């Protein structure tokens, strides 16, 4: 049976080192705590998928040697792989290559900034990679990047000459795929939570609106945000709500 690795790309959830663009409105301690909630929710989502699909969850983490920072955060069955490389592209490519060398038939690398990412989207990525033929599966992020990349071979050219953390990442990656004649499957768009605006959007969706169609309920994240709102009102983290 071919197993697909579902790898969460993650920094060790240390105060002052993660989610720094959420400070303010959050404090550095709150940002680290929210990062832990994101990891718990996304890992739980992946774990549930692995119970019914040919998939296995792990965290692709940085910095090397920080495994203890994830203690009590991830499911017991999750494995660890340290990120290697200077740029994001190098880290993604190296992780894909290493996991394929370990015997996985395919690899999906997923950012850890989208706690409500629907389970159905992840399953669609798995099913696409299980089909015959080579391809790249890309989850289109609303900011012009991608929240997921799935591959059956580590096509290093996909990651070359990309201006990472810009709105051109997805478009340039699709261009790279076309240059090497690699078919692309695009997944439905979703959003990253990486600044005050997207935090407010997440808070509004989890606490004040009906859930988006198919969105993962992110119970750890929801409880964290709800605690802040109940304690001091919504204006600090969700000022756009009427």
Where are these regions (language model features)?
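Short beta-strand/loop segment that forms part of the nucleotide-sugar
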Residues: 54-63
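Short phosphate-binding loop-to-helix
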Residues: 69-106
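A short, N-terminal amphipathic alpha-helix
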Residues: 35-53
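Conserved donor-nucleotide/metal-binding helix-loop-beta segment in metal-dependent transferases, i.e.
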Residues: 117-143
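N-terminal nucleotide-binding beta1-loop-alpha1 segment
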Residues: 1-21
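Short, glycine-/small-residue-rich phosphate/pyrophosphate-handling segment
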Residues: 156-174
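Conserved alpha/beta core of the MobA/IspD/sugar-nucleotide pyrophosphorylase nucleotidyltransferase superfamily
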Residues: 175-242
């Amino acid at each position: 049976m071919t197993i697909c690795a579902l790898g969460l790309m993650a920094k060790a959830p240390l105060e002052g080192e993660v989610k720094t663009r959420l400070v303010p409105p959050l404090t550095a301690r709150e940002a680290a705590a929210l990062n832990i909630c994101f990891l718990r929710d996304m890992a739980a989502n992946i774990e549930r998928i692995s119970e019914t699909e040919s998939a296995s969850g792990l965290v692709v983490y940085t910095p090397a040697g920080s495994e203890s920072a994830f203690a009590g955060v991830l499911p017991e069955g999750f494995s660890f792989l340290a990120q290697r490389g200077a740029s994001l592209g190098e880290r993604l490519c190296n992780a894909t290559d290493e996991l394929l060398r370990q015997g996985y038939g395919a690899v999906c690398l997923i950012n850890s900034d989208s706690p409500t990412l629907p389970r159905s989207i992840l399953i669609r990525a798995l099913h696409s990679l299980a089909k015959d033929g080579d391809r790249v599966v890309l989850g289109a992020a609303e900011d012009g990047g991608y929240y997921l990349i799935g591959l059956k071979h580590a096509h290093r050219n996909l990651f070359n000459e990309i201006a990472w953390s810009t709105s051109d990442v997805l478009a340039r990656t699709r261009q790279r795929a076309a240059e090497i004649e690699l078919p692309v499957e695009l997944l439905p768009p979703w959003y990253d939570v990486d600044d005050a605006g997207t935090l407010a959007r997440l808070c509004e969706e989890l606490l004040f609106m009906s859930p988006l169609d198919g969105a993962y309920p992110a119970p750890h994240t929801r409880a964290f945000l709800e605690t802040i709102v109940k304690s001091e009102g919504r204006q600090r983290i969700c000022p756009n709500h009427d």
